[in-house]
Swiss-Prot record:
PANTHER family: LARGE RIBOSOMAL SUBUNIT PROTEIN BL34M, MITOCHONDRIAL RIBOSOMAL PROTEIN 34 FAMILY MEMBER. This is Large ribosomal subunit protein bL34. GO terms for biological process: translation. GO terms for molecular function: structural constituent of ribosome. Residues 1-44 are annotated as: Disordered. InterPro entries: Ribosomal_bL34, Ribosomal_bL34_CS. One of its GO terms (cellular component) is ribosome.
């Protein structure tokens, strides 16, 4: 049976990267919340 996690740098950046987050209102909310919480890393 194939594993569900098949790592790919490009896919990871495109779906969870900073620019991807900036692009949508929901993503911007994620960034805002992570900034407020004081996360070291905002995105992947």
């Amino acid at each position: 049976m194939k594993r569900t996690y098949q790592p790919s740098r490009r896919k990871r950046k495109r779906t969870h990267g900073f620019l991807a987050r900036k692009r949508t209102p929901g993503g911007r909310r994620v960034l805002k919340n992570r900034r407020r919480k004081g996360r070291w890393r905002l995105t992947v």
